């Protein structure tokens, strides 16, 4: 465009005269001010740094013939194959866009832009970096400038490669086009504008005269030749030469057209294929037109081929900008330019179109045709316009028929609808071979595609209006304008074809026809207005127009290389929602999102978002200006520092476009907030398939938690972290922006991604494995770093994994959050801390989960990418420490990723090991830069800050993080985590420095998460600042703790937290109860972990904070102690909060505490912190652990912090005694609360006798606390839900609902089906204490009781898995686990009470089965579990009768380990101990156990082996389950089975027999044969045989028709709830184990009976176990049937299973009735 042409504008231009659409279209980097070069003109000035290579455009204007151009200053001449040289004239500001104001450079020194033609659209590309305050000056250097020449050449080469394939088709299509002129007419109109783009060669040739005058360079002369040359090449050389011309120059039309042309190439082929049947003629026409257009575009494409990337990059902005100007300019441009295009430039057209001899010019428009036929065909357009009287309501285009008009209007509508989807197109284009040139077009069109319809329509309207002079049809009568499909970027010659294609191919499934049409009409209307307003403006596509209308359309200068943006999009980094465009580190607008197809992912709100984005983007992106990655990283850090301000700022921004400021962080946070607030604007938070997968994975991991989490994710992610994940997690971008550390969705998603490296792959291809590198990369590539997901995943995938689970829980608890409460078992506070993370049902839990997160980080990370994380070593260490726990955690608590990490990280530092361990181990891998941070960060606030910055930086920008935080703030829990994050920094300062390091290492992930956001935004910045503000590291922790610890609400009020922390805290505090702040603190404490597993990290951090700042929370004064505790928690090492001495176990610590007994007489039994003042301890216990009144068992004087635990205890241990309890008011201390045991006893005697366990305080803690915790867990896990509120914390404790641990505590609901722990937990397990709770058994630290419960379940369930049946993926009993999956759902929940007491091992089997089936636990874990379980079972076998007795009445006295004589209150504890932790236990029992498992379920070893083969695994699992259920009698029976291998061959057959049993017992033998053949595994056969044996006995014992009927009915119901059934079976089996053992033995001796008899017997046992026995038996039968089904051929099995069930149910019920009676 010859802007500086000698012809000055008639009058001096003023800003007041600048059309609104121009201002709207201004990119945020530039502003209009009077030019310094030409005083009479307005100039474009950079307000922000503009990187070299950035493109602006396309240049918008009217297409005119050279003769029509009055002022060369504002025009570019472009060669169109059909029309020859046409001028894109923007002399009329209303017809142009802001590029018209870019003045001509007077010298090469001044020049910073050069024109680039892409698809006949002129773009301005930055020739060199432009600093703020510089005026953008463009000049066409032609090929003189090597850089420009190279850029143009690249464009050309790209265009050529693109053209090659489509051209061949074009020739074919042209012939067809001639045949279909009617369609072509529309195409012509549409193409009329498009060709303009094509001709938009920056040739000054047409302008030459004036330009030459104005710019005495030879460019004018040179340009025509070049253009001609280019024309021959299909890409005007000049434009090609200007390839570097940046976005400022290109016109939207040109750009869109370029996209259209390229798209046409692709689209034509596809379109033809897709729509050939329906639209063959039209398509042919269109294709011909498109082909011509493509050919035309091809030339530019050559030039633009290179640009496409840039386009992708810039397209969003460009498109956004274009739309407005384009819409205005397109119509006029179309009409005017069309004539120009018509100007027959007898230049050989690369396409070979005959331009040279346009013998037949159109009298209505300037199009000329080489053939009369072409002209006639073309005339249809005008005729329809004249006759018709059906005008498009959007663009006014006239049609001869209502049908045609409606078809045309649908395009507009589709354009409106597709706007969001269009974002995907660019990426698709990029992916396509056309990626370069076409991509450029696509990118431009991505927004324009949506706009495209309008734009095209506008063009059509323009054509119709200007029909007389503007229906540009190719010689053949083909319309040159290309109409790219928004969805697939296919290019069509006509809007009609494009719309038809869209409707048929893309929209059909999306919208009912009626709706589509209606919706389309409605949507396009606004564009129609625009179109009308800018009818004459030449715009390549209406869609950009629409978008432009919707919002500021400023060319999006996505980072210089589009590929990065695409990568974001492809990697899922770009959030695909309104915020996504902003989210992009690159300043992507909705248009850009469209470009990347993000809009589709996000929502069709792109337009609005665009405006918001613009506004938001400007502030946020200002921080992260054009630097797509690096800048963002820095910005993130900056934001982090300024997080408090950024938070508010971003908050507002986040509302409009939370993701804009800090893509990664903002997205996650905003999504998280979305749940609460942040994403309010993002009504449609898109949950990417990855996120969904993540959520699903989480669901698998935490069935209970996922529902809430998913809701949170979907909602918050739409709603929460998961919500944030929706947008952010959906893609890298999405995740970055949407998932704050606190946001469960994001975090879980991240975590999930982290877990399955592949899930991350999309977002973080090497997310897990390369987390460290990514973190490191974060610094390198801010965008990626910024991508919250990347960071989260990268930084703390394990934590994130845990966070995912935890976050899910948190999401559901934090966001659904006020009721989810997990049993708070004060018993093992410290351990819980470590374990809590895995649980991290809520952010509060997260706080407790601090340690757990570490462990989980290591565990999960180890699982996910053992290769790259020391975390794995941690995991190993954790496993070593508590193989059972670790395994259980993995199996039951994938969410507990950080549980063991703390232990592993002891090396990092006493504090570091606990939370930092995972962080450091994991950060090192995850956090390139952050990896080092963990220890250092923790050690020093600066380090923490760096970590946090790293976290935030990875999250995109701390600024965005704050926004995320802010959104998170709206969702109280997420904010809390951020606050916690703030708290974390101080803890890092404290001995827990490693924890902050984890924050930093995990922080990137946390950033995505609310925590991360908080950390990055407020907490982290605060971390640095706050740490400073804090009097001392401990004080900071204390303040944080005070803020977080004092209670979630305190969080908000915590002054200690930095302003950002407090502001965040306040927001979060106000929105969420006190527990969330704890989680916030936790998140602060372990930002890194939070980043990785936002909530879990939060939990982790909370835990750290709680450990470290537990007292501070309760009593800031003990912040130092807290810190010690925190260190303790963070490290597997237990730290004395008085002297900070680390200890490997709670026992050691407990022994050590006696040293401080004098000075510190009081001790927290949960977190083992010492207190000088009883009131402090009481406050601490109450605030952190939720311990209010103490309940003492009247029988054994055991004290319980929670009545539900006491009741469970009494049920378990004193079933035959009339139990009452004493209740001591809150503040009453238990014997465990005294540092000096003797003193404790004495003082406690006042209230009541001290627990016998008190002699060994450590043991007591372990047993008593564990017992209580176990009791709680049992209550939760057992179907026996206490009728009371059974809030673990107390009846009157109402804490923010913490999601239940990953595994679910099950209680029976009225249906008799185990209710998920979530349900139970939600109501009964409030967990507000974010105290550093340690597992008394393994010393693992947990931040909250829910985490502790999770850990205990993991720790204790390792051996008592049967008892708790907390599975890796807790499947709600309601969600019956399908036997074929081998997942014995936590069926034992219903039977948990009994099994728990006497046969927790059985649950282990079921858990193992579920784990195996889920394949989540590795074979090793399963094997270990099985071995442990087997060991426990062996023990049980030894004491089978004892167990039976215990079931009936658990021995009040402790159970003694046969190996080491250690006493245990619960048989479950003993079993766990014997199975996993007994140091003296011989190896043989495990072997026996294995054999037993083989015999019983054959799943322990068989399942493990079968794990490789799902079918076999399922079968074996089913067998195992069957064995467990039918043969869950003590090991003795299992042994009997193994001893009776003859029956082993019958297992499969037994299954079938079982199925057929209803038919006849005799069938059994038959089925056994086939079954045996199928399930050759002797174990199965043995199982079945045993089961059958049982059944006969059961049958002999009794047959109750009622039970059978009940069973059959239940079976049907349970068939639906196979999982629940399996669980029930497992539990029943466990309960029945002892009885069955005897019965089974008898049955065995009696001889194997039909499967039905065995099943019946098993059912009888279960029924005897409880009234639900019949239902359970049904479940059991059902499970068995399911197993059989899985074993048997899938088709027959189900049917047989049902029949079998029906028959078997009655029989079994009959048998069971007697059994139960027995």
From Swiss-Prot:
Catalysed reaction equations from the record: L-lysyl(9)-[histone H3] + 3 S-adenosyl-L-methionine = N(6),N(6),N(6)-trimethyl-L-lysyl(9)-[histone H3] + 3 S-adenosyl-L-homocysteine + 3 H(+)
Tissue expression: Highly expressed in retinoblastoma cell lines and in brain tumors. Also expressed in a number of other cell lines and in brain, heart, skeletal muscle, liver and spleen. Isoform 1 is expressed in testis at much higher level than isoform 3.
Phenotype upon changing residue 188 to V: Loss of histone methyltransferase activity
GO cellular component terms attached to this protein's record: Golgi apparatus; nucleoplasm; nucleus
GO molecular function, one term: RNA polymerase II transcription regulatory region sequence-specific DNA binding
Motif SH3-binding, residue range(s) on this chain: 970-979, 985-998, 1028-1052
Domain SET: 28-141
Compositionally biased intervals (Basic and acidic residues): 204-216, 304-327, 1635-1645
Biased composition (Polar residues): 189-202, 1525-1556, 1599-1608
Glycyl lysine isopeptide (Lys-Gly) (interchain with G-Cter in SUMO2) crosslink location in chain: 347, 651, 690, 692, 774, 866, 879, 1147, 1151, 1257, 1281
Protein location: Nucleus
Chain ranges of zinc fingers (C2H2-type): 360-382, 390-412, 483-506, 1134-1156, 1162-1185, 1191-1214, 1333-1355, 1455-1478
Low complexity composition bias: residue spans: 738-748, 951-969, 1018-1027, 1042-1072, 1499-1511
Span list, region Retinoblastoma protein binding: 294-316
UniProt KW keywords: Activator, DNA-binding, Isopeptide bond, Metal-binding, Methyltransferase, Nucleus, Phosphoprotein, Repeat, S-adenosyl-L-methionine, Transcription, Transcription regulation, Transferase, Ubl conjugation, Zinc, Zinc-finger
Ranges of Pro residues composition bias in the record: 970-997, 1028-1038
Top EC category: transferase
Residue spans of biased composition, Acidic residues class: 265-297, 1251-1265
Subunit: Binds to the retinoblastoma protein (RB). Interacts with GATA3.
Family affiliation: Belongs to the class V-like SAM-binding methyltransferase superfamily.
Protein name per the record: PR domain zinc finger protein 2
Species of provenance: Homo sapiens
């Amino acid at each position: 465009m010859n802007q500086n042409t000698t012809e000055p504008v008639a009058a001096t231009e003023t800003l007041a005269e600048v059309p609104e659409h121009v201002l709207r279209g201004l990119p945020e980097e530039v502003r209009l001010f009077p030019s310094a070069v030409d005083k009479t003109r307005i100039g474009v000035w950079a307000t922000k740094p503009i990187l070299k290579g950035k493109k602006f455009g396309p240049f918008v204007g009217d297409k005119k013939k050279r003769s029509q151009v009055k002022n060369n200053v504002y025009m570019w001449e472009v060669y169109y194959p059909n029309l020859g040289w046409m001028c894109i004239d923007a002399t009329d500001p209303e017809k142009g866009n802001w590029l018209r104001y870019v003045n001509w450079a007077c010298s090469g020194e001044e020049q910073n832009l050069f024109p680039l033609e892409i698809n006949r659209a002129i773009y301005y590309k930055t020739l060199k970096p432009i600093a703020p305050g510089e005026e953008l000056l463009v000049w066409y250097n032609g090929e003189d400038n090597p850089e420009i020449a190279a850029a143009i050449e690249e464009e050309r080469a790209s265009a050529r490669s693109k053209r090659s394939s489509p051209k061949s088709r074009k020739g074919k299509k042209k012939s067809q086009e001639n045949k279909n002129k009617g369609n072509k007419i529309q195409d012509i109109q549409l193409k009329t504008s498009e060709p303009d783009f094509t001709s938009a060669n920056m040739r000054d040739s047409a302008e030459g005269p004036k330009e030459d005058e104005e710019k005495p360079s030879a460019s004018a002369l040179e340009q025509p030749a070049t253009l001609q040359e280019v024309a021959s090449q299909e890409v005007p050389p000049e434009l090609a030469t200007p390839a570097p011309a940046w976005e400022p120059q290109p016109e939207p039309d040109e750009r869109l057209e370029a996209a259209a042309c390229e798209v046409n190439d692709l689209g034509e082929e596809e379109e033809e294929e897709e729509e050939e049947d329906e639209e063959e003629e039209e398509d042919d026409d269109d294709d011909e037109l498109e082909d011509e257009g493509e050919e035309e575009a091809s030339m530019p494409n050559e030039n633009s081929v290179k640009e496409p990337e840039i386009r992708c990059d810039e397209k969003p902005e460009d498109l956004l900008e274009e739309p407005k100007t384009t819409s205005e300019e397109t119509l006029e441009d179309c009409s005017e330019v069309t004539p120009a295009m018509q100007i027959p430039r007898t230049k050989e057209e690369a396409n070979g179109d005959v331009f040279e001899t346009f013998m037949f010019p159109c009298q209505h428009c300037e199009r000329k045709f080489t053939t009369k036929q072409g002209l006639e065909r073309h005339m249809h357009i005008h005729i329809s316009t004249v006759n018709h009287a059906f005008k498009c309501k959007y663009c006014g285009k006239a049609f001869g028929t209502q049908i045609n008009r409606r078809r045309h209007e649908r395009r507009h509508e589709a354009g409106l609808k597709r706007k969001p989807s269009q974002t995907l197109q660019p990426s698709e284009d990029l992916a396509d071979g056309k990626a370069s040139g076409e991509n450029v077009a696509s990118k431009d069109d991505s927004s324009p595609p949506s706009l495209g319809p309008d734009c095209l329509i506008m063009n059509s309207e323009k054509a119709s209006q200007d029909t007389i002079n503007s229906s540009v049809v190719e010689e053949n009568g083909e319309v040159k304008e290309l109409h790219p499909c928004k969805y697939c970027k296919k290019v069509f010659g006509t809007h009609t074809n494009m719309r038809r294609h869209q409707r048929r191919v893309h929209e059909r499934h999306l919208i009912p026809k009626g709706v589509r049409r209606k919706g389309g009409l409605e949507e396009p209307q606004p564009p129609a207005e625009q179109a009308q307003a800018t009818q004459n403006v030449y715009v390549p596509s209406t869609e950009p127009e629409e978008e432009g209308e919707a919002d500021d359309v400023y060319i999006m200068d996505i980072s210089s290389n589009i590929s990065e943006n695409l990568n974001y999009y492809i990697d899922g980094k770009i959030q695909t929602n309104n915020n996504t465009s902003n989210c992009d580190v690159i300043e992507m607008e909705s248009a850009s999102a469209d470009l990347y197809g993000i809009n589709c992912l996000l929502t069709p709100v792109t337009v609005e978002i665009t405006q918001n984005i613009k506004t938001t983007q400007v502030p946020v992106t200002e921080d992260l200006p054009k630097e797509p990655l690096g800048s963002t990283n820095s910005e993130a850090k900056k934001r982090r520092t300024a997080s408090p301000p950024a938070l508010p700022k971003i908050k507002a921004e986040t509302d409009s476009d939370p993701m804009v400021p800090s893509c990664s962080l903002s997205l996650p946070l905003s999504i998280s907030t979305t749940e609460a607030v942040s994403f309010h604007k993002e009504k449609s938070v898109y949950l990417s398939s990855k996120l969904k997968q993540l959520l699903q994975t989480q669901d698998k991991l935490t069935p209970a938690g996922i529902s809430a989490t998913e809701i949170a994710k979907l909602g918050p992610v739409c709603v929460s972290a998961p919500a944030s994940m929706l947008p952010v997690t959906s893609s890298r971008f999405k995740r970055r922006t949407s998932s704050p550390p606190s946001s469960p969705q994001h975090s879980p998603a991240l975590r999930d991604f982290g877990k399955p490296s592949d899930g991350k792959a999309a977002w973080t291809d090497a997310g897990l494995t390369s987390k460290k590198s990514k973190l490191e990369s974060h610094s390198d590539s801010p965008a990626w770093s910024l991508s919250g997901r990347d960071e989260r995943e990268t930084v703390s995938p394990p934590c994130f994994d845990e966070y995912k689970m935890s976050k899910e829980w948190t999401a559901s608890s934090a966001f659904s959050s006020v009721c989810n409460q997990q049993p708070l078992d004060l018993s093992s506070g410290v351990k819980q801390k470590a374990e809590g993370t895995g649980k991290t049902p809520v952010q509060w839990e997260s706080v407790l989960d601090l340690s757990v997160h570490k462990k989980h980080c290591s565990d999960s990370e180890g699982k996910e990418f053992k290769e790259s994380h020391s975390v794995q070593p941690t995991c190993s260490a954790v496993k070593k420490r508590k193989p059972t726990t670790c395994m259980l955690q993995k199996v039951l608590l994938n969410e507990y990723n950080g549980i063991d990490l703390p232990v592993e990280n002891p090396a990092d530092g006493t504090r570091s090991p606990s939370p930092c361990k995972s962080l450091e181990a994991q950060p090192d891998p995850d956090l390139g830069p952050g990896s080092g941070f963990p220890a250092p960060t923790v050690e020093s606030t600066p380090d923490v800050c760096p970590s946090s910055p790293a976290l935030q930086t990875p999250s995109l920008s701390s600024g965005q993080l704050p926004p995320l935080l802010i959104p998170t703030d709206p969702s109280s829990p997420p904010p809390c985590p951020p606050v916690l994050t703030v708290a974390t920094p101080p803890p890092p300062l404290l001995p827990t420095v490693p924890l902050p390091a984890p924050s930093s290492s995990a922080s990137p992930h946390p950033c995505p998460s609310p925590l991360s956001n908080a950390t990055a935004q407020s907490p982290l910045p605060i971390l640095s600042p706050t740490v400073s503000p804090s009097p001392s590291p401990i004080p900071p922790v204390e303040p944080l703790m005070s803020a977080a610890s004092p209670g979630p609400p305190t969080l908000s009020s915590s002054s200690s937290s930095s302003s950002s922390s407090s502001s965040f805290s306040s927001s979060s505090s106000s929105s969420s109860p006190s527990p969330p702040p704890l989680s916030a603190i936790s998140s602060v404490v372990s930002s890194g972990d939070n980043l990785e597993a936002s909530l879990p990290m939060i939990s982790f951090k909370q835990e750290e904070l709680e450990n470290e700042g537990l007292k501070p929370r309760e009593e800031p004064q003990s912040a130092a102690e807290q810190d010690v505790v925190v260190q303790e928690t963070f490290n597997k090492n237990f730290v004395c909060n008085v002297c900070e001495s680390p200890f490997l176990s709670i026992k050691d610590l407990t022994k050590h505490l006696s040293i401080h007994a004098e000075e510190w007489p009081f001790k927290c039994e949960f977190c083992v912190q010492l207190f000088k003042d009883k009131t402090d301890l009481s406050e601490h216990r109450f605030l952190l652990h939720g311990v209010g009144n103490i309940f003492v068992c009247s029988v054994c004087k055991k004290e319980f912090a929670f009545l539900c635990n006491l009741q469970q205890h009494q049920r378990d241990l004193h079933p035959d005694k009339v139990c009452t309890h004493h209740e001591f008011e809150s503040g009453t201390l238990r014997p465990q609360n005294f540092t000096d045991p003797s003193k404790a006893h004495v003082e406690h005697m006042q209230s009541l006798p001290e627990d016998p366990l008190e002699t060994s305080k450590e043991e007591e803690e372990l047993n008593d606390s564990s017992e209580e915790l176990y009791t709680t867990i049992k209550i939760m896990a057992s179907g026996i839900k206490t009728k009371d509120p059974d809030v673990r914390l107390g009846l009157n404790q109402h804490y923010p609902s913490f999601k239940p641990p990953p595994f679910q505590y099950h209680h029976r609901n009225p249906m008799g089906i185990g209710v998920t722990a979530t349900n139970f937990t939600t109501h009964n397990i409030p967990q507000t204490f974010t105290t550093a709770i340690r597992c008394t058994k393994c010393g693992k630290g947990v931040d909250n009781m829910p985490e502790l419960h999770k850990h205990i379940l993991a720790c204790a369930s390792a051996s008592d898995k049967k008892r708790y049946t907390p599975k890796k993926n807790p499947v709600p009993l309601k969600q019956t686990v399908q036997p074929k999956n081998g997942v014995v759902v936590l069926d034992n929940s219903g039977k948990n009470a009994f099994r728990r007491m006497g046969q927790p091992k059985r649950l282990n089997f079921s858990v193992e089965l579920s784990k195996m089936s889920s394949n989540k636990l590795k074979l090793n874990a399963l094997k270990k579990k099985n071995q442990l379980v087997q060991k426990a079972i062996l023990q049980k076998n030894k004491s089978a009768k004892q167990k039976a007795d215990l079931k009936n009445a658990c021995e009040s006295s402790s159970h003694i380990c046969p190996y080491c004589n250690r006493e245990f209150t619960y048989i479950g504890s003993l079993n766990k101990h014997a199975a996993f932790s007994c140091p003296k236990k011989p190896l043989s029992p495990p072997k026996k156990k294995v054999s037993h498992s083989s015999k019983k379920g054959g799943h322990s070893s068989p399942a493990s082996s079968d794990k490789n083969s799902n079918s076999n695994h399922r079968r074996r699992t089913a067998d195992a389950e069957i064995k467990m259920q039918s043969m869950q009698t003590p090991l003795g029976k299992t042994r009997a089975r193994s001893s009776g291998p003859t029956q082993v061959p019958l297992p499969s057959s037994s299954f079938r027999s079982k199925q057929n049993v209803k038919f006849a017992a005799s069938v059994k033998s038959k089925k056994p044969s086939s079954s045996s053949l199928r399930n050759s595994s002797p174990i199965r056969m043995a199982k079945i045989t045993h089961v059958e044996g049982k059944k006969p006995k059961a049958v002999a014992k009794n047959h109750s028709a009622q039970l059978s009927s009940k069973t059959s009915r239940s079976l049907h119901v349970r068939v639906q709830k196979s999982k629940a059934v399996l669980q029930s079976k497992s539990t029943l089996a466990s309960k029945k184990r002892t009885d069955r053992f005897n019965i089974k033995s008898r049955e065995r001796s009696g001889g194997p009976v039909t499967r039905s008899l065995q099943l019946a017997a098993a059912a009888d046992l279960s029924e005897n176990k409880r009234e639900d026995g019949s239902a359970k038996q049904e479940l059991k039968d059902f499970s068995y049937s399911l197993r059989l089904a899985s074993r048997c051929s899938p088709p027959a099995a189900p049917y047989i299973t049902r029949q079998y069930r029906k028959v078997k149910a009655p029989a079994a019920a009959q048998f069971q009735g007697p059994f139960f009676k027995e």
